[in-house]
């Protein structure tokens, strides 16, 4: 959460960030509910909100460099741009969707897309870090 959240909060301010979290929470669980309308399985967690923060972050800071650990037999540290990281993360969510999983990929994808679009439509300035 704080890898991306603190930067988004700094940009939006505490009040707007709190409102953003509530909106993305409702929208991400809404996507999950629409896709799984007849399911009786409860959903617990805030991963849709975290995904929304990631969507907001990649819109605001697409060129920010992230230090990541890539598994090539051992963990290999490298830096990549935020948009590249988010691209691979988003693709991983689609692969989760293809398999049978107890992970709410619908909330992840919905949260990410709504987070990205909410910030984009709010016309916040992008930063080229």
Which residue ranges define each predicted feature?
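A detector for small-residue-rich transmembrane helices and their helix-helix packing motifs
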Residues: 1-129
């Amino acid at each position: 959460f704080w890898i991306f959240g603190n930067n988004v909060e700094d940009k939006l301010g505490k009040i707007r960030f709190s409102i953003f979290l509530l909106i993305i929470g409702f929208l991400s669980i809404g996507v999950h509910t629409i896709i799984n309308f007849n399911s009786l399985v409860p959903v617990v967690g805030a991963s849709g909100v975290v995904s929304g923060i990631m969507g907001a972050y990649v819109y605001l800071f697409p060129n920010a460099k992230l230090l990541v650990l890539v598994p090539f037999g051992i963990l290999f540290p490298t830096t990549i741009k935020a948009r590249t990281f988010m691209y691979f993360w988003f693709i991983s969510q689609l692969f989760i969707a293809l398999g049978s999983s107890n992970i709410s990929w619908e909330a992840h994808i919905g949260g990410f897309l709504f987070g990205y679009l909410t910030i984009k439509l709010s016309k916040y300035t992008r930063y080229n870090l």
